[in-house]
Amino acid sequence: MLDAALARFLESGYAATTVDSIADDAGVSAATIFKSYGGKPGLVRALCERALKGAGPIPAEHRSEELKQAEPDSRRLIEGWGRLTAEVAPRVAPILLLLRDAASGDPLASALHGELDRSRLKRMSLNARHLVAAGHVRPGLGLAATRDVLWLYSSPELYDLLVRRRRWSVDRYSQFVADAMIAALL
């Protein structure tokens, strides 16, 4: 169902996609989708959750936490975050951008977009707190500024601009994100 939903959303957009069309594509009833996901917002939430897990058997968020605990060198830590950002962005950015674009015309999409954006900001706050507490950021750069830098460079908009629109490779994007965060923070 999720694969059918993703394909339909990306092809038709959020507003034009119906649960019935997703159900037809998935070979299930609309009632099954409503029972499993509660409708379009629930499908998008499930798609985001799946995308944020990343490519490996261990979810990217857990690998980020493991990296924080295992890597004492701030430069290598941020390079690792750059790789994780580049791993997750191709999966999640199109979904988040679709939701962002739908938010102005759909209150449920707007609420979900706000929730997911706040969740990313919270994750970046935790990462910033780690960097600041460990004394990794340059003097004068506080928690809020560190958080905002991490939040900026993990944004779906940046991925969209560089990879989807400017045709950068994901490897180039990964290196850019790491280099830019290092330059801004260390």
Predicted regions and their residues:
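Ligand-binding pocket scaffold of soluble enzyme catalytic domains
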Residues: 1, 20-21, 25, 32, ...
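Solvent-exposed, amphipathic alpha-helical segments
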Residues: 4-11, 64-67, 95, 149, ...
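Amphipathic alpha-helical packing segments from all-alpha helical-bundle domains
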Residues: 83-100, 107-134, 144-148, 179-183
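Helix-turn-helix
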Residues: 4, 8-42, 46
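Short, basic, alpha-helical segments at the C-terminal edge of helix-turn-helix-like DNA-binding modules
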Residues: 19, 48-55
